[in-house]
């Protein structure tokens, strides 16, 4: 299966957490900001990306590849000028408002006031 077909398959089979997050990010619903879902970037496919702000949002769950893979992936994405926010699916499902606040804060380059912070934030120095 080529990357384009694989990406289409991911869009059609999103996790519950990805679907919930997409409901809030799609169609400029977050403060007029444009996100894309299941977007190929180089050798990777990211869950959500805001190209203008160079921000990637990842939903991590049971199928998650692990910390070593994330470190390699995030290092490559960072080298391309992106910031990466990672949230556990459980947080997206149970603490949706806090997750959305953390994303909003990252879009506006502010620290979140929420007690929830992303599991990992990678910023380019």
Predicted regions span which residues?
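Solvent-exposed, charged helical/coil patches
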Residues: 1-33, 107-125
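Basic, amphipathic alpha-helical patches used to engage nucleic acids or provide basic targeting signals
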Residues: 10-15, 42-107
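A generic structural motif
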Residues: 33-34, 82
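A short, acidic/glycine-rich surface segment
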Residues: 34-35, 44
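Charged, terminal alpha-helix-loop-beta segments
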Residues: 38
């Amino acid at each position: 299966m080529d990357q384009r077909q694989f990406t289409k398959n991911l869009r059609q089979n999103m996790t519950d957490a990805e679907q919930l997050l997409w409901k809030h990010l799609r169609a400029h619903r977050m403060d007029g900001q444009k996100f894309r879902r299941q977007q190929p970037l180089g050798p990777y496919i990211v869950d959500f990306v805001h190209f203008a702000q160079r921000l990637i949002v990842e939903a991590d769950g049971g199928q998650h590849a692990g910390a070593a893979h994330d470190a390699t992936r995030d290092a490559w994405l960072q080298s391309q000028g992106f910031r990466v926010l990672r949230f556990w699916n459980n947080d997206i499902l149970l603490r949706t408002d806090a997750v959305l606040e953390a994303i909003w804060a990252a879009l506006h380059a502010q620290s979140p006031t929420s007690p929830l912070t992303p599991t990992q934030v990678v910023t380019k120095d």
